[in-house]
């Protein structure tokens, strides 16, 4: 089996790792960075991903960030020009970019991947992530929870040590807490909890709101209505947040942020860590409830926890670290990089799948309860949250009315007692139930959850044996045909992007060659035959003409022709120089001098030349 890469598809940044020699290793992106911004931009018909997309976000309104926050949303689309994109398609562009530079690093095609998701992602969000992988041309071998992945990265070399660990995972857009039992190579998730709409972006927004309010107070101008100004504020807020992890105050300086009646306006503010802690205190406090719930579900107390692991870039915030220490009574473990741990753990799971990692068993859980709607709009649970997966559970129900010919199976996920308050995963109907008094027909409803946390539900009339089933699709409703179409479009875009890159490289080559040819012609003037110079000049003009006509095939041919002529002319230049030197009796080159020296020390002329050379060097030194 070929290599299985592990991908942390993050809200603000993504990372990828692969197993090498039984150890996971981060694959750096083309810019040499270990994480890649989860940013996609559309510019002049070209799709840009990562660093380059983030850099031009200020000036390009067609830049998409934090798309992960919308995964699994039924009707969410991003409009660019006259085309609309689903969150799966945008995520697929990020995955496709990661796939490409991973292939460049490994030197072989990459087909298989393990992709991580927040532990508290529901079925729709998980399915949407899997669909994004398919569109990107990846065979998603496994979807695993981010805290579980970081626990794998932490626990791989801990051997048979028996520990209970709490993973506090605060990323760019999501928050999870999981409690795991580690021992003898078994990673068992005991409980998980979280908030899929809480993360570093919210911390940034607190700074942005403060800056907007301060600027409005001073200048009576609302920057929130200026898209370009808001992008600059977002970049400045993110930088300030990072700065305050290491220093107690930071300067925010944004010149020419707006204009007033008297000319340009600048934004200058000092933000202290104490101010930042105060404005984000409610966000930090919001993470406490999931921590308490996870402990409660695992039937543990703080005293039972051996280690606390912090995961996600937002856990670098000192107030977050202090709060976690206060709540758990434990100093967080800093042995793994919070930005990289999830990708490293995903790579380990990839190694388990490919057979490269032995004696590691991962037992994950379903984050939310699953069940169906029953009479009176009640949510009847079949599988409770934090049940180890894969799992299967069935229950027998009956009809609510006499001679009821069909039952509507409304599949739900959540924790609220009433069906209307929970998340609908899907609906299907079991028909042709023989007429009978209410309560007589026996309808068995069975839930199956696979290792990826994806649900299949079936209903069977035990009297007739008739059955119906449904594999829950993402609520964003992508059919297999739509996924295939998007996959094809993604491949075509990749081909078009590659072609565009080749075109740019060719044009750069031509510009460089024309410039170099001009320089070479000046250097060789009077030193090579005129006919050779004429040939080069003619070829140069032919290339310029092809360049003006933008004929790529012709440009390639003319570039190669000119390049060969310039090389031939340069060779002649050196040959002529060598002949002239030999005619004057001097050594033609260092090699000739060595050869002369090898012929014997009684060759007085060679000795004289050597002495003269030394003498000249000394004279030069004296001049200095």
From Swiss-Prot:
Start-end of Low complexity biased regions: 581-600
Up-regulation conditions: By stress conditions e.g. heat shock.
GO MF terms, alphabetically ordered: ATP binding; ATP-dependent protein folding chaperone; unfolded protein binding
Statement: the UniProt record of this protein carries the keyword ATP-binding: yes
Keyword DNA damage recorded: no
Keywords: ATP-binding, Chaperone, Nucleotide-binding, Phosphoprotein, Stress response
InterPro entries in the cross-refs: ATPase_NBD, Chaperone_DnaK, Heat_shock_70_CS, HSP70_C_sf, HSP70_peptide-bd_sf, Hsp_70_fam
CDD domains according to UniProt: ASKHA_NBD_HSP70_DnaK-like
Disordered: annotated segments: 544-563, 576-624
Record field: compositional bias (Basic and acidic residues): 601-624
Location of Phosphothreonine modifications: 174
Function according to Swiss-Prot or TrEMBL: Acts as a chaperone.
Family classification: Belongs to the heat shock protein 70 family.
Protein's name in the database: Chaperone protein DnaK
Gene name per UniProt: dnaK
């Amino acid at each position: 089996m070929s290599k299985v890469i592990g991908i942390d598809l993050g809200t603000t940044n993504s990372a990828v790792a692969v197993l090498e020699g039984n150890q996971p290793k981060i694959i750096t992106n083309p810019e040499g960075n270990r994480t890649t911004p989860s940013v996609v931009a559309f510019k002049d018909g070209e799709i840009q991903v990562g660093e380059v997309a983030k850099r031009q976000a200020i000036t390009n309104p067609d830049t998409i960030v934090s798309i992960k926050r919308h995964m699994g949303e039924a009707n969410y689309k991003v409009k660019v020009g006259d085309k609309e994109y689903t969150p799966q398609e945008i995520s697929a562009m990020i995955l496709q970019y990661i796939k490409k530079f991973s292939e460049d690093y490994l030197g072989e095609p990459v087909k298989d991947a393990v992709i991580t998701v927040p532990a508290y992602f529901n079925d729709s969000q998980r399915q949407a992530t899997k669909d994004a992988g398919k569109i990107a041309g990846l065979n998603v071998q496994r979807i695993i929870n981010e805290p579980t992945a970081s626990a794998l990265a932490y626990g791989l070399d801990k051997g048979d040590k028996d520990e209970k660990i709490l993973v506090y995972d605060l990323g760019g857009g999501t928050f999870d807490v999981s409690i795991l039992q580690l021992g003898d190579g078994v990673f068992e998730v005991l409980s998980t909890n979280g908030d899929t709409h809480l993360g570093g972006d919210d911390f940034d927004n607190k700074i942005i709101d403060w800056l907007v309010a301060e600027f409005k107070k001073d200048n009576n101008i609302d920057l929130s209505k200026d898209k370009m100004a808001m992008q600059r504020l977002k970049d400045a807020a993110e930088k300030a947040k990072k700065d305050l992890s290491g220093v107690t105050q930071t300067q925010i300086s944004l010149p020419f942020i707006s204009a007033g009646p008297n000319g340009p306006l600048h934004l200058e503010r000092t933000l202290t860590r104490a101010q930042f802690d105060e404005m984000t205190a409610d966000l930090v406090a919001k993470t406490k409830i999931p921590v308490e719930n996870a402990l409660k579900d695992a039937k543990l107390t703080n005293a039972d926890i051996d280690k606390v692991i912090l995961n996600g870039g937002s856990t670098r915030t000192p107030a977050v670290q202090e709060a976690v220490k206060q709540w758990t009574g434990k100093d967080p473990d800093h042995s793994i990089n919070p930005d990289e741990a999830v990708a490293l753990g995903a790579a380990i799971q990839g190694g388990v799948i490919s057979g490269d990692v032995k004696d590691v068993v991962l037992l994950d859980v379903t984050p939310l309860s699953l069940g169906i709607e029953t009479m009176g709009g009640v949510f009847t649970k079949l599988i409770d949250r934090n049940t180890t997966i894969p799992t299967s559970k069935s229950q027998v129900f009956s009809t609510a009315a006499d001679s009821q010919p069909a039952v509507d199976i409304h599949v739900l996920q959540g924790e609220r007692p009433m069906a209307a308050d929970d998340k609908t995963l899907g609906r299907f109907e079991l028909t042709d139930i023989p007429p009978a008094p209410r309560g007589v027909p026996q309808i068995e409803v069975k839930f199956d959850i696979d290792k990826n946390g994806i649900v299949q539900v079936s209903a069977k009339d035990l009297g007739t044996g008739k059955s119906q089933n449904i594999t829950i699709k993402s609520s964003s409703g992508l059919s297999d045909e739509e996924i295939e179409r998007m996959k094809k479009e993604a491949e075509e875009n990749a081909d078009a992007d590659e072609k565009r890159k080749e075109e740019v490289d060719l044009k750069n080559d031509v510009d460089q060659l024309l410039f170099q040819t001009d320089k070479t012609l000046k250097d060789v003037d009077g030193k090579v035959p005129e006919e050779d110079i004429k040939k080069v000049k003619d070829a140069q003009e032919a290339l310029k003409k092809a360049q003006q006509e933008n004929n790529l095939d012709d440009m390639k041919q003319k570039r190669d022709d000119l390049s060969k002529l310039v090389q031939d002319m340069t060779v002649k230049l050196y040959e002529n120089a060598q002949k002239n030197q030999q005619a004057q009796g001097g050594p033609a080159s260092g090699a000739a001098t060595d050869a002369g020296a090898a012929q014997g020390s009684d060759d007085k002329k060679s000795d004289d030349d050597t002495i003269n050379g030394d003498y000249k060097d000394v004279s030069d030194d004296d001049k200095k």
